Amino acid sequence: MKRYLTWIVAAELLFATGNLHANEVEVEVPGLLTDHTVSSIGHEFYRAFSDKWESEYTGNLTINERPSARWGSWITITVNQDVIFQTFLFPMKRDFEKTVVFALAQTEEALNRRQIDQTLLSTSDLARDEF
């Protein structure tokens, strides 16, 4: 009987804590830089880019890679599935630092342009897919 009561009390406590968590609001973390690279050169590009990234942009960026053993890697930086920068990285790291610095500058410029476009082209009477 004691064991039965213990199980009932434990079950009630579990249900009570479950109800407490149901009322909580999920917190979204802004400004994530997501790594979707596969090869070592892609990972190094992501590390170099993220180490130097100092933007106040609150959206999420994704760095994607399409590797090729023969030719190198095609790196794409996207925001909400919109491509804002693409480059080709060679496996021998030719001009690697220049490419990272150029990617940072172009990404920052593209994000600024995107923000200006969204501000100027705000069409509150149309849905996003209608414009």
Curated annotation (Swiss-Prot):
It comes from the Bacteria. Transmembrane segments: none annotated. It holds the Pfam family CsgE. Keywords: Signal. Residues 1-22 form the signal peptide. Coiled coil: none annotated. May be involved in the biogenesis of curli organelles. NCBIfam families: PRK10386.1 (NF007701). This is Curli production assembly/transport component CsgE. It comes from Salmonella typhimurium (strain LT2 / SGSC1412 / ATCC 700720). The lineage of its organism: Bacteria, Pseudomonadati, Pseudomonadota, Gammaproteobacteria, Enterobacterales. The gene is csgE.
